[in-house]
Swiss-Prot record:
InterPro entries: AAA_dom (IPR025669), DNA_Partitioning_ATPase (IPR050678), P-loop_NTPase (IPR027417). Keywords: ATP-binding, Nucleotide-binding, Plasmid. It comes from the Bacteria. Signal peptide: none annotated. One of its GO terms (molecular function) is ATP binding. This is Virulence plasmid ParA family protein pGP5-D. ATP binds at F9, K10, G11, G12, T13, G14, K15, T16. Pfam families: AAA_31. It comes from Chlamydia psittaci. Disulfide bonds: none annotated. Belongs to the ParA family.
Length: 259
């Protein structure tokens, strides 16, 4: 099982939207078995898929007792796509953020028990760097950093890098993805070029442009490709999904080609 954390230093970067839609595309289009984990107490990923929140069958149970993962996993309406939902009780862990040493790596231990049942696990992290993000980063193989083309993006990337160093897990950045991209705005390219000089080769070529169908699909508790398959957003996210999939499974494809 390949495990990747979708992260950002602040809200409004499209992180949860990408977690939901890339997970959905991998399950439906690529026929991968996918597990989503909602680490945000706001539970937007959970509600976006129409999953009912149950405090005793959720991420809360795993963070307190890592041996309870199987009853915390819920099926979604999408074939091959399961989710570990968040709940309001997960908010309690934010109170421990000032002492990140208190984390005991429950999520990593729990996911090891189901690693043979899934091809990909996507962790949707909260827009802050504390214990919940630490749990996600320690359980992950890769990071997908979600940014918007603005000055604070550069600062956010540096904060994420410092956080990884603090917790002793220098994760490989699988890719940096830009949401709310406007190719007509020259400042978008300016910020991207600055980040490219610092993180050479890490910016993914697929950009997610503004599209109202993204928010409309969430109101329908659906992925974009299901609700609006011909939309610009569906095309952008599908291209991004293929790019991420190629990076995740490139070694396996290389082995198959040589056989």
């Amino acid at each position: 099982m390949k495990t990747l954390a979708f992260c950002s230093f602040k809200g409004g970067t499209g992180k949860t939207t990408l977690s939901l839609n890339i997970g959905s595309n991998l399950a439906q289009v690529s026929r991968k078995k996918v597990l989503l984990v909602d680490l945000d107490p706001q539970a937007n990923l959970t509600t976006g898929l129409g999953v009912q929140i149950q405090d005793d069958h959720s991420l809360n149970e795993i963070l307190r007792h890592s041996n309870e993962i199987r009853r915390a996993i819920h099926k979604t309406k999408i074939e091959n796509l399961d989710i570990i939902p968040s709940s309001v009780l997960v908010e309690d862990f934010r109170g421990l953020d000032k002492d990140i040493s208190l984390s005991v790596n429950h999520l990593h231990l729990a996911l090891q028990k189901v690693q043979d049942q899934y091809d990909v696990c996507i962790l949707d992290t909260p827009p802050s760097l504390g214990i919940l993000s630490q749990e996600a980063f320690l359980a992950s193989d890769y990071l997908v950093v979600c940014l918007t083309p603005e000055p604070f993006s550069i600062l956010g990337l540096q904060k994420i890098k410092e956080f990884c160093s603090t917790i002793g897990n220098n994760l490989d950045i699988l890719g940096i993805v830009f949401s709310f991209w406007d190719e007509r705005n020259s400042t978008n390219s300016t910020y991207m070029d600055i980040i490219e000089t610092i993180y050479e080769g890490k910016i993914l070529s697929s950009k997610i442009r503004r599209d109202v169908t993204v928010s409309r699909s969430l109101l329908k508790e659906s992925s974009v490709i299901n609700a609006y398959p011909n939309s610009r957003a569906a095309k952008d996210i599908l291209n991004l999904t293929k790019e991420i999939e190629n990076k995740l499974f490139s070694d396996e494809k290389l082995v198959q080609e040589t056989l």
